[in-house]
């Protein structure tokens, strides 16, 4: 009951730090993430070393945030405005993402919690559009942890369209997982 409009970030690239608090880009790349110029050093490969082990990968690279499943809780908490990342993304990304968040906001506002269900096909569309090894619900319900990170790759993981095999003639054949086109 603040009388102030409340906005929350609901979809897109998560900052490793709490957004607006990261100094790593300034210190390493000379570009302030707090001024919209983040060099994304969290998306670089890093190596963790201790006396007993070493681990390499994209250890500081979070998966992208997807809050479609959380919309009822966010609306009930009094959130007025949903922020969707779109910087340096294709128009298709912004269009589909905004469409789906509008669709599910309207679904909840008209049908309530008992009729609220996010279709798997819609989540798959978002995954096909852009994801870093899956989505996370970020910091909404728990502290960050390994399940929040995309340590194998820092960028779009592409589309899994099927399985390939080499036939007897030495040609590549692809067995599609679903209809293409």
Feature locations, PLM:
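Surface-exposed amphipathic alpha-helical tracts and adjacent flexible/coil segments at the periphery
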Residues: 1-181
């Amino acid at each position: 009951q603040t009388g102030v409009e409340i906005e929350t970030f609901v979809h897109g690239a998560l900052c490793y730090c709490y957004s607006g608090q990261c100094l790593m880009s300034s210190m390493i790349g000379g570009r302030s993430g707090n001024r919209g110029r983040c060099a994304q050093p969290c998306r670089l490969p890093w190596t963790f070393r201790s006396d007993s082990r070493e681990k390499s990968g994209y250890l500081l690279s979070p998966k992208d945030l997807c809050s479609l499943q959380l919309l009822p809780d966010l609306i009930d908490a009094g959130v007025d405005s949903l922020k969707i990342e779109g910087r340096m993304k294709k128009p298709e990304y912004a269009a589909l993402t905004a469409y789906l968040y509008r669709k599910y906001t309207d679904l909840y506002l008209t049908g309530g919690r008992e009729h609220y269900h996010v279709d798997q096909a819609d989540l798959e569309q978002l995954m096909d559009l852009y994801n870093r090894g899956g989505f996370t619900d970020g910091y909404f319900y728990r502290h960050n942890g390994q399940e929040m990170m995309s340590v194998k790759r820092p960028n779009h993981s592409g589309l899994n369209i099927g399985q390939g095999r080499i036939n007897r003639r030495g040609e590549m054949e692809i067995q599609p997982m679903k209809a293409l086109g």
